[in-house]
Amino acid sequence: MLTTPKSYITFIGRIGKKNHQFPRHSCLLTSPFGRKAMQFFDTHAHIGLIYDDPIEQLRVIQQAKQAGVTRIVSINNSLHDFERVYPNLKALPGIYHAVGVAPSEVTNPGSNYIDKIEQYLSNPNVVAVGETGLDYFKQFGDKRSQIELFITQLELAQKHNLPVIIHNRDAGKDVFDVLSERIPDSGAILHCYSEDAAYAKKCLDMNIYFSFAGNLTYRNARNLHETIMNIPLDRILIETESPFMVPAEFRGKRTMPAYLTSTAKFLAEMLEMDLEELSQQLWKNSCKIFKLSEE
């Protein structure tokens, strides 16, 4: 049974007031004296789409760390993009990588793409396969070809004992059906979650995590708000999906990993949790799915 707590109804009413604003966050989120600063983990950022310039990419990382976002998973839609971005970021502490072919590239995944993915999965700090999945909104290729590309990468994730990062747009049923049969043992992340609470609850029997982007902060994102209220806290991740899905307080700008704390603050208020407590749980969740030390 889906639940809608009274506290959530009150919360939605509050953010609906025209003069209500969430407090602007400072550059660095610090805990009281003698305690460690809060740390945040951006589980999905397209660094190479924010800026082409390698120097600007490094500045994005620096700004994120100043804002308390000390770990980021760098995402690319194609192997070509991975080959362009990875060399620039590979030596940076706290920056991790996923390798895969998104459904947008289904008609041209690249020659020998399977061999190349396997090769790159052995690179330092590569922690996941992805992003991959299904996208029926823009009708990239045909559905059968997308599903075949998706399954191929799920099998690679299983072979290499890695989680998979999943793109799902207007393809929820097929994504669920494929995962029901082929989800890798290391689990999956439904990134930039866009389905409803009922869909999420069906997924709970599988080792699936739900990653929420800046659109969680939109007042009309009722499906996302209800999902948050109906799934365990230990399955929740947050991401920026940079440069897309900008949080409400930064509307009109390109999303940056540094903006992740805006989504975290919104989520903390929504769940009536202390931000530091929430940040610790999100950190733990992220490290668990990517098999990283929490230290």
Task: List the predicted regions and their residue ranges.
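Mid-domain alpha/beta scaffold segments of enzyme catalytic cores
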Residues: T4-R14, H20-E295
